Amino acid sequence: MGKNFSNLKVILVEPSGPLNVGSVARLCSNFEVDELRIVSPKCDIFSLEARKMSLKGKKFLEHCKIFDDLQKSIFDCDLVLASCGRIDVNKNSFFGSSEDIFDWTLSFNKINNLAIIFGREDRGLTNSELLLANKTFNIPTSQNNPSLNLSHAVSIALYELNKSSKRNFDQELKVFNLASSKQIHDSFLEIEELLFKVGYLLKHTSNAKISKFKNFILKANTSMHEINVLRGIVHQINLSLIHI
């Protein structure tokens, strides 16, 4: 797969079917994925069923990383995409079709770690989990039955990414280093602490306000330099408050 990212990670959240996990491991081999990550699996991902389905993708099962929290699984990632089967989220400006999202993703000159998150077989990803992503995407299907099988969704997404990577883009590539998920998360903690300190955030309204601010930062495709500037401003304000 010709690509402008050095590490592609497929992340499954609480998968409950070993056959699906095995099929996804096989797909990782088909599409040159670098790593399979699983968050709080609800089945035996190393079962005979999973291994039989994985075929040449067995190494992805054997070396997959398991996390107890989705946030931790994306800390080292520069760009995070999340699959969403719900049609109502298209009201958000960070939502798009799988084809559009992958074309947008590949408009960046260099991405060190790209993650694609897929939700639970029965209910997908929660709203709070979707907010961890820079962008969410939907695979267009019939409105009468929009939900896809997990492994089918993964196969279509990886195919779309592969197809996008082989296109010739006319637009100029965006040349800057994206901030990692951990850098953004750490900056949010500092900003949240400051906003509580100055009285902008209150306990009963803080979650809603900080979620909107996180959305704003994630949709902006923030660079490492921009995050460092933001953290520098927060640090300087904190120093000034000490002397008031």
Q: Where do the protein language model's features map onto the residues?
A:
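Amphipathic alpha-helical segments that form the core helices of the histone-fold
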Residues: I210-S223, V234-H235
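Amphipathic alpha-helical repeat scaffolds
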Residues: S16-S23, P146-H152
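S-adenosyl-L-methionine/SAH cofactor-binding core of RNA-modifying enzymes
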Residues: L48-L125, K166
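Conserved small/polar residues in nucleotide/adenosyl-binding loops
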Residues: I242-I244
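Mobile, glycine- and charge-enriched loop segments
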Residues: M1-P15
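Structured adenosyl-cofactor binding patch, chiefly the S-adenosyl-L-methionine
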Residues: N30-F31, E129-L173
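Short internal beta-strands
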Residues: D34-P41
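Internal, active-site/partner-interface "lid" segment
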Residues: S164-G199
